[in-house]
């Protein structure tokens, strides 16, 4: 496609035309989960947003031209703490959470990334990078710890657009007598006897969190690549530290050219976070909410804006998809999406704009023929919506309904009998009972038809 892609780049907080380093091999790195607990809806937002970006890049440059890396952090203080609390080994915990995470991604109908590397498979690369930073005098060793010396990197704070002293004052900085200055951050630290550890030139220990992404992005994408993404909470200190250690280790003036960050999901205008217990886990929705409903809800606000999560949002999205399935028709192979349809997504991933476009296409499909219906469904499929057949959608609604089909038909029969007897009060009571159980009825051409809400 000839249309340009525009993205808001947090390096300068401006919307810029996306120009890849090499359009034959575009690199995108997104910070994935730290697998100490199951993902919640707040974690799902970047998964969905960067899946959309992955799809957009593939649509423009080709499916085999995008190298999308989404890492898994499987060594971390939170993991150690969680494993002890749950009386599990580290490997048992991380393997369980990784499996659940992958199941959640399938539930949301996300495209698989090109690679999903685990931190523990790349410890040797991290040790090598630390050694390089020490040799170049950007890092120092104290009591089996290795720290990055922030004052030696002049561009520190550029991504956050803040001075160093402001960043330190406004964040929780690890306090340690080993550091030269409070802003220095750990690259390697010793492990206790019951904690995961690896041999290194500085003794048995494990890497700092920030180093993991620098080592893995270097392996899979090189010293400089196109896009780095994650939640807005990662800008500082995680992404700021990544930039510092990567540029210093690699002697590069750039780490990633475009930095994309999504805003938080809130509940009652408070950030959703595991640390506060203010969370809704993805797995808790699976029995009662179809994944595409959840996905549409996550796309209902622009990724740069906070999204307040509530039951009405979910209900509205379910009703929208229910309506859209009324015109469902498997898309024809020859039909393609033109640039005009995809234009909102090319403009800084404007998902609300794309959803508005889908409503327009639905109206045309409702009045048009098979070609209009196929085009509408294809446009929905592009973002992973209407990916199930109409029969599968109805079957899911039946499973979660508190009433079976035989009971529905029996109640409709009783209602029809009440209407024949002119007992309209009783007929209304039965209608309302069905409605309470999620069943809508309509009298049409002398018959009563029903559908699940």
UniProtKB/Swiss-Prot annotation:
It comes from the Bacteria. ATP binds at residue 274. SUPFAM superfamilies: Anticodon-binding domain of a subclass of class I aminoacyl-tRNA synthetases, Nucleotidylyl transferase. GO terms for cellular component: cytosol. GO terms for biological process: cysteinyl-tRNA aminoacylation. Belongs to the class-I aminoacyl-tRNA synthetase family. PANTHER family: CYSTEINE--TRNA LIGASE, CYTOPLASMIC, CYSTEINYL-TRNA SYNTHETASE. Monomer. This is Cysteine--tRNA ligase. It comes from Pelagibacter ubique (strain HTCC1062). The gene is cysS.
């Amino acid at each position: 496609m000839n249309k340009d892609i525009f993205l808001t780049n947090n390096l300068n907080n401006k919307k810029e035309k996306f120009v890849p380093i090499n359009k034959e091999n575009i690199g995108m790195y997104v910070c994935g989960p730290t697998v100490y607990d199951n993902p919640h809806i707040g974690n799902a937002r970047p998964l969905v947003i960067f899946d959309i970006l992955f799809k957009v890049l593939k649509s423009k440059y080709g499916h085999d031209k995008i190298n999308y890396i989404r890492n898994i952090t499987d060594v971390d203080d939170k993991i150690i703490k969680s494993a002890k609390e749950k009386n599990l080994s580290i490997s048992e915990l991380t393997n369980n959470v990784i499996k659940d995470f992958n199941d959640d991604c399938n539930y949301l109908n996300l495209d698989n990334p090109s690679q999903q590397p685990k931190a523990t498979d790349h410890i040797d690369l991290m040790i090598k990078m630390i050694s390089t930073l020490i040799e170049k005098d950007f890092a120092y060793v104290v009591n089996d710890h290795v720290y990055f010396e922030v004052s030696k990197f002049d561009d520190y704070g550029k991504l956050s657009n803040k001075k160093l002293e402001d960043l330190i004052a406004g964040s929780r900085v690890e306090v340690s007598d080993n550091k030269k200055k409070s802003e220095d951050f750990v690259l390697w630290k010793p492990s206790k006897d019951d904690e995961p550890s690896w041999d290194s030139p500085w003794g048995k220990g494990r890497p700092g969190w920030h180093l993991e992404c620098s080592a893995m992005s270097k392996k899979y994408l090189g010293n400089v690549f196109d896009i780095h993404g994650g939640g807005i909470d990662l800008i500082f200190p995680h992404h700021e530290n990544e930039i510092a250690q990567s540029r210093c280790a690699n002697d590069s003036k750039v780490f990633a050219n475009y930095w994309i960050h999504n805003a938080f999901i809130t509940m009652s205008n408070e950030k959703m976070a595991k640390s506060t217990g203010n969370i809704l886990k993805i797995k808790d929705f699976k029995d009662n909410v179809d994944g595409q409903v959840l996905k549409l809800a996550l796309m209902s606000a622009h990724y740069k804006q906070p999204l307040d999560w509530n039951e009405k949002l979910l209900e509205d999205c379910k009703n929208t998809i229910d309506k859209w399935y009324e015109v469902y028709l498997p898309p024809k192979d020859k039909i393609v999406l033109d640039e005009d349809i995809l234009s909102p997504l090319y403009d800084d991933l404007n998902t609300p704009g794309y959803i508005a476009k889908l409503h327009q296409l639905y109206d045309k499909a409702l009045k048009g023929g098979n070609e209009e219906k196929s085009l509408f469904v294809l446009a929905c499929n592009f973002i992973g919506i209407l990916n199930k057949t109409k029969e599968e959608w109805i079957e899911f609604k039946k499973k979660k309904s508190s009433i079976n089909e035989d009971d529905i038909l029996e109640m409709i029969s009783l209602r029809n009998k009440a209407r024949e007897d002119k007992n309209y009060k009783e007929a209304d009571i039965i209608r309302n009972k069905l409605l309470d159980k999620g069943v809508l009825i309509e009298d049409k051409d002398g018959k009563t038809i029903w559908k699940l809400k």
